[in-house]
Regions:
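Beta-strand elements within well-structured catalytic alpha/beta cores of enzymes
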Residues: 3-7, 162-168
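Loop-to-helix element that buttresses phosphate recognition and phosphoryl-transfer chemistry
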Residues: 3-5, 10-64, 138-146
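General small-molecule cofactor/ligand-binding pocket signal
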Residues: 5, 73-75, 213
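Active-site metal-binding loops of divalent metal-dependent hydrolases
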Residues: 10, 170-171, 216
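Phosphate-coordination/substrate-recognition cap region in phosphate-metabolizing enzymes
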Residues: 35-120
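Short, well-ordered beta-to-alpha junction loops that form the rim of enzyme active sites
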Residues: 51-52, 77, 164-171
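Acidic, low-complexity terminal tails and accessory targeting/binding regions
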Residues: 81-105, 109, 141, 156-163, ...
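Alpha-helix-centered segments that form part of catalytic cores
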Residues: 108-149, 153
Length: 248
């Protein structure tokens, strides 16, 4: 049975002038992930990435450890959710509800933990059925449709029995998981924040996986040798790539 492997990019350069690139730790995470796949003999028949630099660089570093690395296809539908666009559009509404929210946004520009709280509030408002139409940024429904389309196209392009590497971001993975599991909108962020850099979420390419359960969520690679028979979706990360839980 073929699978899609959704791999979050390595740590980006939070706080630098060029956020959309891997930090030294992010580069190491990607290199170790590539070595992990090589060590367990998992060879990809195709590779797809969003068009963000941190996603593409992660893919390049992972794939260089493959004996016959596939060419990386670019699909912008796998890009991260537009956090900045959502913040700009939703900030006035959220500040009306909470006078301290604007200050939290200001502090969050230089404090990754505070920024994560801003992302949580904005993301939760964005996926809510009550979210108004936002100028300049996609709606939750449109973004999710794009993610679904990208994954379905990847499945259609995969050769029989061939596994696919998909290099993407935490919000994209959370969206995919919410689609597969059919979770409520107020539960979606719970699948966003825990996604480690270079963690790996596996989706079996069968219709049944759309309503299956999530297991071994963000577990270390040692659990990979104990695959539950009923598992259709699982997430793990290479043990050696552990680092601080990042927000980038």
């Amino acid at each position: 049975m073929a699978s899609l492997y959704l791999i979050r990019h390595g740590q980006a350069s939070f706080g630098s002038d060029h956020y959309d690139q891997l930090s030294p730790l992010g580069q190491r995470q990607a290199d170790l992930s590539g070595q992990f796949f090589a060590d367990i003999g998992l060879h990809f028949g195709q590779a797809v990435s969003g068009d963000l630099s941190r996603q593409r660089e992660t893919g390049e570093r992972v794939l260089k450890a493959q004996p016959r690395p596939p060419e990386q296809r670019i699909d912008p539908r796998l890009n991260e959710v537009d956090n900045e666009g959502q913040i700009a559009a939703l900030l006035p509404m959220l500040c009306e509800r909470d006078a301290g929210f604007a200050e939290q946004v200001k502090v969050g520009r230089h404090d990754s933990k505070q920024y994560q709280k801003v992302i949580q509030a904005v993301f939760s408002a964005w996926v809510s059925p009550d979210c108004p139409e936002l100028p300049g940024t996609a709606s939750w429904c449109d973004y999710l449709d794009g993610v679904k389309g990208a994954l379905e196209d990847a499945m259609d392009c995969a050769e029989s029995g061939s596994d696919t590497a998909i290099f993407t971001s935490g919000g994209t993975i959370a969206s995919a998981v919410s689609w597969v599991l059919g979770v409520r909108h107020d539960q979606i962020y719970g699948f966003y924040e825990p996604v480690f850099n270079c963690s790996i979420t596996r989706r079996n390419t069968t219709t049944a996986c759309r309503r299956s359960t999530s297991t071994t969520w963000n577990r270390r690679s040692r659990s990979w040798t104990r695959r539950p028979r009923s598992t259709r979706l699982s997430s793990f990360r290479p043990r050696a790539a552990r680092g601080p839980t990042p927000t980038t």
